[in-house]
Amino acid sequence: DDDDSSSSGNWQDLSKTYEGKSVNLVMGEVTIPVDGKSVVIAASSAEKASVTLNNIIPENKSVVIDAALKEADGTYTFTGESTVGDCVVSVNGTVKGGVASVVYTRKLTSSIVGNWSLKAGAGAIYANIVTGNSTIDNLVPMIKPAIGNLIWGKVSAVNVNLPEDGIFDVSWRPIGASEDKGIGEITKMASIQYCVVDGKFMVVVDKNYVTVLTTLLQQAAGDKLEAAGISIDEIMKLLVDLGGYYGLPLNMKVDGSEATFYADKDLIVPVL
């Protein structure tokens, strides 16, 4: 009798906020940092629950998914999906011992999904660095030759890969080489994704990794930044707060299989 009541009533105990040590997050096959993120489960029966992902999906700070519940041997599983803009978010998770383990995927259906050749030449890359801060704006002449030498002098092609799983990737082929090199493994491990928010293409970085990235930037170019009177805080002002992520907004112009990325046309400074 007791067993019957506990097994049929346990679903009511699922309804709570799972965060910190009570939640595990995996995007596809990659473990995601949980700081600043949470999963809220609200079970309405032993078969149904709503699952809310907070600060987990770049497209929206809070994504609610209607999920089907099943119980076996004290473990509840939940599955469901929801569409946010042009992104289909799917979850498949378990709750056992008060811990929610959530595996989720993003599947982008946008027309920008694909492998794009970066259009070579002066118009290929633009940066939104007309900030009104003269120290940042004065960096443009320094950046132009640096990026020009880095990219076009040493590679024969640059591709921006925008796969449907939402992981941002760039690959390039060094002159004389027969194979491409890329940053896909790094962007996957560091959860560097892309999304479309309010029609704007954004490259997004998990806030938990921004500290690491800014530290590396400080180590690599801190003296140059300091000499120019620029702080990491000034750079951060160029980013958009997307909840669990920071986004760098860019416009994307497609011409056949080639693409050009640029900032708001009113604020464009060609970098190359």
Which residues does each PLM region occupy?
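N-terminal glycine/threonine-rich, aromatic-flanked beta-hairpin/loop signature
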Residues: 23, 30-66, 127-245
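Buried hydrophobic residues that stabilize the cores of well-folded domains
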Residues: 56, 71, 115-118, 141-145, ...
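Beta-sheet ligand-binding and adhesion/scaffold domains
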Residues: 73-112, 120-122, 200-272
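Acidic/polar, low-complexity intrinsically disordered N-terminal segments immediately downstream
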Residues: 1-139, 149, 167
